[in-house]
Amino acid sequence: MFPPQVATKTVYTNWKQIVKLIPPQIVLEAATETKILSRTFTPWSHLLALIYQQLTRTESLNGVCDAAAAFECEWGRMRGAQVPHRNTFSNANRRRDPKMAELVFWRMFDYLKRLCPEFASCKYRGFLSRFKERAIHALDSSTIQLTLNCFDWARHRRRKAAAKLHMNLDLGNRLPSFAIVEEASHHDSVRAEAATANLKCGDILVADRAYTDFKFLCSLAMRGVFYVVRWKRNIKLEVVSARPTEKPEAGKRSEAKVRVLRDEIVNPAMPGTAKSYSCDGGVLRCVTAEVEYDGKMLEMSFLTNNMEWSARTIAELYRARWGVETFFKELKQTCQIRDFIGYNENAVKWQVWTGLLVHMLLRYLRHVSKWKHSFSRLAGVVRACAWLRRNVVELLESFGANGTARGGIRVVEVARPLYLQAFLPFDAGPMGQHG
């Protein structure tokens, strides 16, 4: 149930209120830089159609075009946007440079940070709250499965096709600080240098075993960046010395989510790896611990260049890396980046970058409305009320903490019984006659 219809500060639809968050100058500058020229279907109209497709999870070109045609008057009020036609929309996705959507995303991110500094502020919780003065980044990638018969440009392995989204996520605000969309044929470590170019001295990087490349780790250490990566079993290490570990109390052993087993100082054993990791005298720290994952305790080993933090801190930092996996799961559940409305590379990139933009706008709405429930539920409410004329922030605030919108729907007048469409009551016509 939704709140009763009362006077609000706006007569705009929820859909228009969300779109109005994007300043027109950002779209104009991005279109100019990418040299997108058009006579009728403007870059703003193109971006608006893709945002609607993401926000409502529409699965086809016809779905977007039919919705725009059904609400043609409302669509035109959004800064004079043109209603998309199927062929025009498809050609724009195929031919226009998706760099425009990427520029709009990053500049919109900067705009929201200036508009509401608390939106992008660092908010570490729990064990990581001790790192208030350090930025913690999680590096990972997510594979987007495609069909080889349709997406032949994205051939992955022998009989598969896939695209890949590389992400450097700031764990303080759970927002991306770097992203690349490309075909999945490249290994994750190929984009590691570019994805971490914005890290500063004193920052912390956590990554999985795909990024355990000693040449890459050496470059991070030389820049003063602390890293925590998972050890690969095929990498041979030579133990130099063992460090003492704290033993948990008997009563807390079963409740602990991290239990340290070993803490050792190691060197790369193979000549090739030792040559690649020449910084810090080739000395590394290897922490082995049992970490809770999906309700089970798994033994994992981590490599780091920090010799001062406790072994439990190293393990807890790696546990924080799962925040980027939560981000990918959240993105795929709320935005349309599994079923694509175009087959070529440009169309896929347009849709992925627009999905990231819509996800960021929804995150902003969650922040300003102080939403207390799951993110997928917020996306569902916004999707269901896209054409409702309500203040979108007041609508989300009305759900409160109990999960039910304050104020119910009350029946004002019932003139006659209501029947299902195309059905009549039993006694509506003469009995025993055809027709």
What are these regions (language model features)?
Residues 154:
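A glycine- and small-aliphatic-rich helix-loop capping segment at beta-alpha/alpha-beta transitions
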